[in-house]
Amino acid sequence: MSDLTPAEIVIELDKYIVGQAKAKRSVAIALRNRWRRRQVPEAMREEIAPKNIILIGPTGVGKTEIARRLARLTDSPFLKIEASKFTEVGYVGRDVESMVRDLVELTVTHLKVSEREAVREKAVRLAEERILDVLLPRPEGPQRADGDEPLGSHIEIVSDDDGRVSTREKLRTMLRAGKLKDRYVDLELADRSMPMVEIFSNSGLEEMGVNFKDMFAGLLPKNKKRRKVKVPEALEMLTDEEAQNLVDMDRVVRMAVEKVEQSGIIFLDEIDKIVATSKGSGPDVSREGVQRDLLPIVEGSTVMTKHGAVKTDHILFIASGAFHMCKPSDLIPELQGRFPIRVELDALGKEEFFRILIEPENALLLQYIELLRTEGVDVAFADEAVREIAAMAEEVNAGTENIGARRLHTLMEYLLEDLLFDAPDRAGTKVAIDRAYVTDRLKTIRGNEDLSRFIL
């Protein structure tokens, strides 16, 4: 889906996120520009840098949801991480370069899975042959051509070549038909596990870009693990092993690094949490240090990973923050300049809450309806009941902390608490939820401001 037009991207986001048209347009253009850059001549391609985006808006308006949906929408390497996890170099915690390492590791894993799926058909055929070798050893004796011993319960050896081939084909037919599912076989599988070693755990081995598995691969003996399992499980295990052997990991790593460098996207959530809220010494100094550590990564630098050097020049960074205790201008000026596109997301009111409850795919009301249906309880919400829930969410947000659409989750739990508890005893019943039901269940919150503060 990497060649979606901006309009198509917005349509996809509209299925899950209500409103926020400006934010959707900005991320849609940024995604499309990734595709456009790949189409220009190579000499110009290196000069086109991504325009990083910062999404500004109160909590619960859809910033993080946009990131979640983008991750599913694009086939580009995508990582969402909270900026508050990072600490300045020299402090206990993770340094900012670890997000690039995480993105590379994630991409390698995804590519490895897709490559294994591509060779799965061949791996299944090879696994079948290995199972048949176990069930029907070769007439030369117990030694296989590759030197491994075929272990386990097996069929009596047939000396005649034609008879042996015929027996092998009969076994293959039975194997594919599932007639051998209750037979046990003994297997020898490569033991790919590594001994648990914890060295310098506070600094984190991944921070050094060291792959201890590769370092010890030539030193540790290649052990084999012997297991007795049923034929279907044996076939699955052998298929995984054969697929692993068929995948060229050097090629996968090269593809992953190139993909990260050319089309990687990092979503930095809660970037406002690394803004210094006051002048002076203390933890805020470390926060400013994190911002300064971010500068070279966002602008473009080389990060060492266990898979090699990775350039960040063309990685797209999308940051988001509520900025309710600070302003975007409180970021250090150098970092502000690295995010040229700023989008302010709108606060949500009762009309948006009403749409959130019913419009998106797998909307919140539909989730509760389906959950209760599993117990045999058929729930129906009247239109005025939904509007009352939306109005209540707006009212509680205005009277306490404004947490946006997240208020709907807590109100729905409070509204349906008794029904969710008693559902197993009400199988086969129908429940109609109207405005009076909503008003009655939520009247204590509306009438008691102190209580409403606890409805987070």
Swiss-Prot record:
- Which GO MF terms does the UniProt record name? ATP binding; ATP hydrolysis activity; peptidase activity; proteasome-activating activity
Any GO BP annotation: proteolysis involved in protein catabolic process
Q: Which SUPFAM superfamilies match?
A: P-loop containing nucleoside triphosphate hydrolases (SSF52540)
Gene3D superfamilies from the xrefs? 1.10.8.60, P-loop containing nucleotide triphosphate hydrolases
Q: Which PANTHER family match?
A: ATP-DEPENDENT CLP PROTEASE ATP-BINDING SUBUNIT CLPX-LIKE, MITOCHONDRIAL-RELATED, ATP-DEPENDENT PROTEASE ATPASE SUBUNIT HSLU
Q: What does this protein do?
A: ATPase subunit of a proteasome-like degradation complex; this subunit has chaperone activity. The binding of ATP and its subsequent hydrolysis by HslU are essential for unfolding of protein substrates subsequently hydrolyzed by HslV. HslU recognizes the N-terminal part of its protein substrates and unfolds these before they are guided to HslV for hydrolysis.
Q: Which organism is it from?
A: Desulfosudis oleivorans (strain DSM 6200 / JCM 39069 / Hxd3) (Desulfococcus oleovorans)
Q: What is this protein called?
A: ATP-dependent protease ATPase subunit HslU
Gene name, per UniProt, is: hslU
Q: Which SMART domains match?
A: AAA, ClpB_D2-small
